[in-house]
Amino acid sequence: MAKKNKPTECPAGEKWAVPYADFLSLLLALFIALYAISAVNKSKVEALKTEFIKIFNYAPKPEAMQPVVVIPPDSGKEEEQMASESSKPASQNTETKATIARKGEGSVLEQIDQGSILKLPSNLLFENATSDAINQDMMLYIERIAKIIQKLPKRVHINVRGFTDDTPLVKTRFKSHYELAANRAYRVMKVLIQYGVNPNQLSFSSYGSTNPIAPNDSLENRMKNNRVEIFFSTDANDLSKIHSILDNEFNPHKQQE
């Protein structure tokens, strides 16, 4: 009688099941972790973020504003224009502080948790709606801003921000709103440096036609959106000090109330 042969068993037996089970366990853990991340409690995260800010005295950048920085070309023509803009320093001796302050009427100082923002309408600063040439009358006002900056703690950082409205650019050398806003912010920053502000405290950003403060549905609102902002940022230790100095300089009537 013929002997039956046993079926050949896999040499590895059931060993494959162990690593396969481990793989499934890891895959399950991954999906649980992904679900936990997606279902995170935003209020708890914000509370934790606030506590870390207090601990490290860190002033975060507003999340809603994401600038695009455009570096203007460093041309000889630009240097000549900058020189002509600051070619009349002698007149400053005949200007009183009140007269200089009147040149900046229309500017707005806003105090925030991260520092202060001085908003300057572009129709005050520049020759026309699509120009980056600073009005000669405003040079003394920018000089005054530079002197005020020099009174602030050295840890204060100043970011000059350029904004435009959404009017299409026609018959201008600028290819985009970002480029126009960048050149404007850059020029204001250069004048601040000329009047003695430490370059290490300065930077500039361009937001183009993004982040409007009013709907672009009227001439008045477009003038509000077409602006340069000087953002004074600092840590919690110097916050009350810069608020006090800037309020005293730009909003003196507040101190009298």
Curated annotation (Swiss-Prot):
Domain OmpA-like: 113-236
Organism the protein comes from: Helicobacter pylori (strain ATCC 700392 / 26695)
Cytoplasmic side: 1-16
Record key words, sorted: Cell inner membrane, Cell membrane, Chemotaxis, Flagellar rotation, Membrane, Transmembrane, Transmembrane helix
Gene responsible for this protein: motB
Gene Ontology BP term (one): chemotaxis
Location in the cell: Cell inner membrane
Keyword Cell membrane: yes
Protein name: Motility protein B
Spans through the membrane: 17-37
Family: Belongs to the MotB family.
Compositional bias per record (Polar residues), positions renumbered to this chain: 83-97
NCBIfam families tied to this protein: PRK08457.1 (NF006285)
Sequence segments annotated as region (Disordered): 74-100
Membrane topology: Single-pass type II membrane protein
